[in-house]
C-alpha cells in the first residue's frame, strides 16, 4: 500500500491518497480554481512602429545641471552590428571611434516642459541623443532601447535611477499624438565620413587644403591600405571624443561638446575667414557626437565554411530579420547608395576660397613701467603689508595665497588668436590674493564631498581600469562648472568671512604674465616649457596604448602611427601625461604655479569681444576659461588664450583658482 500524507509540525498525519501496488513520484496538489485574468498582449503585429514616451527629459542623472529649455529635440540613430568573419574591431569604423554602424533615423521635438512622445521603428536597437538649439548632443546614450510593434515604451527622464518612480503629473506630450520622425535630408542612412563630412571639406576647405603647400590635405578619394581616408586621418586628430570603449559611468552633460575640440574652436574663431552654413555646422556636430567615424559600413563576406557556405550575410540577415522581427530588416547598403545618388543629383561641389579677412590694424600700446622683471616685482611687493596668506578651510586642509600687486599692463596680443585682440591698456586698481595652485580635489570636497573628478580617458579597448586617475586628493579638481566654482567660493566666503571669488580675465592675465609682455611668463611661443608647465608634449605619445590592460605602444607596432594622433610638441618633455598636483613646475615671478598648463581655469568674465573693457554692458551666454592644460599645445595655452564654455558646462580639463579681494 502506497500513500500520500500531509504531516504537520505536531506530528498529525492525514492521508490524502492511497493506492495498492502503485507509487507517487513528484505528486502535485491541485484544486479547482477560477482562471485568473490575463494581461492583454501589448504587441500589435500589424504595426511596424513602437511609441516612445519620456515624461521629463531633465529628470535623472544624465542632464544634471542643465537649465530647463536647453533641450530642443532628440536625435535618434539605430545600430547595425558586425557580421561573422568580417573585419569589425573597435578600429574598423575609425580611430578612437566605435564598433557599429550608426544609422541616422531622424529627430523629434521636445516640449517646453521636457516631455516628448514619438513613434520610431519597432524591433530596432535605437539610441537617443538630446540636442540643444545648435543641434549639439547634450548627452550620449551609449546603450539602446528596442520597442515591440505597437508597444508604448516609457521612461521618466535621462538616465534616471532604476528605482525612481514617475512623477504623477500631466505633461504636454501626454496630451498629444506621437510625433513622427523628421527624417534626415536624403533619407535614413548610415553616417559615413565620405558622404557627410567630405562634402563640407570639398566646399569650404580644399581650396587651400589641396595637398599643396603647408596645409594638410583634406581632399577626398584617397585611402590607405586599411581603408582610412587621407582627409579623415588629417582631420580627426582635432576632435575630442571618447572612443570605442570608455568609462561606463554616466557622462557629464556636454562632456564631449564640440567646443572642447580644437577643430571647432579654430573655426569659431574665424580660421582664415572660413564660413560654414547652419546645415554644415550641424553635420559637423553630428560627426563629433557619433565619435568621429570614418567608414560607417561593413565589408561583410560571403561565407565559405559549412554549414553557412554560400550565404550572403547582409542579404541573409535582412531575410531573417524580416521573417522573425515583423519586417524590420534593413538594407543599409542600399541606403548608402541611395544617398550617394542623391548627392550626385545636387551637382558638383565647387570649392570656395574664403574671402580675405580685413587686415588687422595693430595698434602698439605702451604702458609706463611695463613690462617688468623680478626686481620690479620685489619692489612692488615690498609696499604690501603681507605677501603670503594661509587659509584653513577645514581641519588640515589649507589653501596658500600669494599677494598680487596692483598695476597696469597691455591685455591681449596680436600674436594670439583673433579673440585676443584688439589689445587694451588695463589697470588693476587694487592688489588681491591669488591661490598659488589650482583648487584641488581635496579642497573642493570640503564643500562638495560627493564630487568626483574621475578619470582621463584611455585609448584602445580591453581596459581594466576606468582611465588615468584625475581624482587624487592633490590633483586639481576638474569637471566643475563655472556655477559650481562660484558656489564653492560663495560658501567658503560665508565660512571664512573673506571675499573669496574667481578672478576676472584681467586679473588672471595680469597674474599670469607677472610682468611679461611675451606669450608666456617665461618666453615666447617657442620657449622650452619642460620645467615650466604641463602641456601637450612628448609624453602625450604615451596615450597611444595597446593590448589587454593597455600599455604604451612600441614604435614598431603597426597601429602606432594611427594612435599617436593627438597634437603635441614632441621636442619638449615635461614629464607628465595628465594633470598633477603640487609644485611640479617652476612658479612665475608672482609665485603662481601652473598658470599656463595642467588644467585651464574659470574666470568670472563673460566671453565678449575685445578690446577688454571691465565696464562693458555686452554680455554673453558663455564664460571664459583661461590658460591651457596637459592636452593643449603652447599655441592654445598662452597668457592671452581664451576659451568659451557654458557656465553650467563641466569640462574635462577645466578647473579653477581662487582669489581673495580686499
Question: Positions of the model-derived regions?
Answer:
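Short, solvent-exposed loop/turn and secondary-structure capping segments
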Residues: 40, 86-87, 129-131, 140-141, ...
